[in-house]
Amino acid sequence: MLNRRDFLKATGAAGVVTLGGCAGGSSKATGHVVVVGGGYGGATAAKYLRMWSNGSVEVTLVERNTEFISCPISNLVVAGEKTLADITVSYEGLRKWGVRVIHDDVVGIDTEKRRISLAKQGELAYDRAVLSPGIDFMWDQVPALKNAEAQAKILHAWKAGPQTVALRKQLEDMKDGGTYALTIPKAPYRCPPGPYERASMIAHYFKTKKPKSKVLVLDANEDVVSKKGLFVKAWTDLYKGTLEYRPNSELRDVDVANRTAILEFDKVKVDVLNVLPPQRAGALVAQSGAKLANNRWAEIDWLSMESVNVKGLHILGDSTLSAPLMPKSGFMANQHGKVAAAAILNLLSGEAPSTEPM
């Protein structure tokens, strides 16, 4: 049987395992766990810490947003198939599990004293902390987009929320016969199939509503990095003449005023330019002192999701240095949350994290 250690450390393959039961839960566990980030990883960890401890562990979730907006399926909003309200939920479900939810920003973390400083609501002491801050963008790689004014014109919409709606409006306002271009950074990045999905859905929108319009995919990678067969078949069978895919097209910068993508050997002017910048772990991970690979992604012990160099600090989701074949996805963040919850409960009980399958 493939055990959890072998799976997480060796394969990391999504879709071949379900981490379902309480492998590490223990009613002997006590203490206070602070979870920062209420996305798929953090919210899952908070819930299962309460569930698997039978309520004996105190859990506080710190999340700046008052509602959760799902990044997975947000492309449906961009394509006009759903509204932002359709993919938005409250945090009341976590409160029902006994999770204390605080809406605030983290401004500092002292991992030696095990204290987290909030912008408005003082400090939180913790026995163990979970960071699940998602991604931040490497704006220095796209110099023209370093300022907020430029970012409001050339959108990423890779964090679901206002930019999701704004990108939809840009597409609606674009004249029929215009061109939408999507730039994709070199992997790894959040949600490997997501850009190709977005391009395909916008191609469908154009085909049905703006048939003279075009989709141009400028991919820094040498080929489609996820689900290639499915996407290429769709582009050939359904969107031939509507969608053009260009590999090895790495973005160097942007001419914001003229909506132009500046590539190494070309400049591409379009009507709607959608730039996905290179990405790294959320800034809080670096601020915590956690070891980063290539100054980008957190190195962790996959058995416990604990930082390799900061004890008591567990890091989840897109911020981690992914194992081979493990995508940065909501599904995997959910699994990370369960693995971390089980391991933390073992550790708070004075036990080692379980190596048994979950």
Locate each region found by the language model.
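N-terminal secretory signal peptides and thylakoid transit peptides that target proteins
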Residues: 1-14, 19
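Glycine-rich, N-terminal phosphate-binding loop of Rossmann-like dinucleotide-binding domains
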Residues: 11, 133-134, 277-278
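A Rossmann-like FAD-binding core segment of flavoenzymes
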Residues: 96-109, 113-116, 124, 204-296, ...
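FAD-site-proximal beta/loop scaffold in flavoenzymes
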Residues: 147-174, 269-272, 276-334, 346
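Beta1-alpha1 glycine-rich phosphate/pyrophosphate-binding loop at the start
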Residues: 25-100, 186-227
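Glycine-rich dinucleotide-binding loop and its adjacent helix/turn
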Residues: 133-209
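Internal hydrophobic alpha-helix adjacent to the cofactor/substrate pocket in enzyme cavities
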Residues: 333-357
